[in-house]
């Protein structure tokens, strides 16, 4: 049972390795490859919680805080990597590249530290740091730099809004 629990922790941790490979792809200018690694990391994040509950990792490996591990990996994949993509691929006007990326990182720190981020009925309160999906939409919809900047500002503000958003991505 311990081996299974540790394997689940390893699986969760593989998400940050996938994110790192996405980071390398960004630095190599391979946007599509970065999105592939981002998607693989999203897949890992989508099932690791279920696997953790099935393996009872909290009871079997109590010395490892799986929620903290998941938050570290998520912060990287949902916030750091997308912020870098916005900067590297110049998705906002040049004078706002650093402020936009910095704003994403700053509000994401709050998001991942907010213990009330997930509501009791499985919604997220405010914008839940889905910057990876937002960046994908920017590319797929070929939105303008100004549209992207305005969207980023709105999502940053929505991070602090006391409204429920996006329930279908939350593992129950």
Please place each PLM-identified region on the residue numbering:
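Juxtamembrane loop-transmembrane helix junctions in multi-pass integral membrane proteins
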Residues: 2-6, 29, 61, 65-68, ...
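Helix-coil boundary and interhelical linker segments in multi-pass alpha-helical membrane proteins
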Residues: 21-37, 72, 76, 80-102, ...
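Alpha-helical transmembrane segments of multi-pass membrane proteins
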Residues: 38-45, 104-114, 152-162
